[in-house]
Amino acid sequence: MIIVTGGAGFIGSAVVWELNRRGVEDIHIVDHLGTTEKWHNLANLRYSEYHHKDQFLRDLRAGGLPKDASAVIHMGACSSTTERDADYLMFNNVHYTRDLARACMAAGVRFIYASSAATYGDGSQGYSDDEATLDRLRPMSIYGYSKQLVDLWMRREGFLDRAVGFKFFNVFGVNEYHKGEMRSMALKAWERIHEHQRVKLFASHRQGHADGDETRDFLYVKDAVRTVVQALDPAIPGGIYNLGTGQPRSFLDMVKAVFSAAGREPDIDWVAMPEELRGQYQYYTCADMDKAAKVGLAIPSTPLEEAIRDYVQGYLMAGRAHLG
């Protein structure tokens, strides 16, 4: 049995979908549905049990993992990069992950967890996933800091030889519909095109950067989860790995791809970036994928335009269809 935390969320539900594609259905999902629309992400998936995240943690602390658990894929977290409640992030992202990691190590169970490219901060220290460089990283948000704390703790406890952490870069795609302001630019652009035939993008406020040329390592969720599930293979060594394409693309590239997939000519309004975002805004990210490639992990390779076309034409134009 495989446990997937955050299994009703964006990446977590896509992990369950990928497991289903490989014939795996004995899956326990851990999440908090509340009054959100996340339950739609589960409707087409096959799994054997659902646990509320708080009850699961109480059971974990009282008696450890379920005896038949063979692996834990821990995608559950507060993923809002603008969350300001540091205590909430410390509990939900740091302490919850620590408790789960300890239980997995004690039981000899494979542990795969989500770190983030937000740990790289402004990128001045590069984007190498060499664990020896962790101490040099300076995240720009409390979200990134919470992920950094987990990476440092995993290394300090000596768990990284038996666990795999993925530093996700900019993931977009199917099943992200519930994410509010954390929706990808691809989805936001589609919504604007669908409703107003135009898209708003932040104008550059930094000298030397043209409007729209801020780059990200955009990663299609279908590619991302193939690599995550591959890490269940014990032949993949433990450690922290970047998860991106290794190919930076601009926001303008992405928006143009959405217009093209929707069969429209680009029509863009440039708007000023809010003051509160300017100090923590990244102008360039790109995953160094050498380490992942050396251990045989699949490097996501779907071209941006092809991924956007699949997302827009296969799902968004079909009424926000879900995976499964």
Residue map of PLM features:
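Amphipathic terminal alpha-helices
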Residues: 21, 303-324
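Non-catalytic, hydrophobic alpha-helical segments
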Residues: 224, 228, 243, 254, ...
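Glycine/proline-rich active-site loop of Rossmann-fold NAD(P)-dependent oxidoreductases
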Residues: 171-187, 206, 210-214, 221-222, ...
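NAD(P)H-binding glycine-rich loop region in Rossmannoid oxidoreductase-like domains
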Residues: 44, 53-54, 58-92
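Mid/C-terminal beta-alpha module of Rossmann-like enzyme folds, strongest
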Residues: 186-189, 195, 227-277, 322
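Catalytic helix-loop patch of NAD(P)-dependent Rossmann-fold dehydrogenases
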Residues: 91, 95-99, 106, 110, ...
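Conserved C-terminal active-site "lid" loop/helix of NAD(P)H-dependent oxidoreductases
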Residues: 221, 275-299
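N-terminal Rossmann NAD(P)H-binding glycine-rich loop of SDR-like oxidoreductase domains
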Residues: 2-22
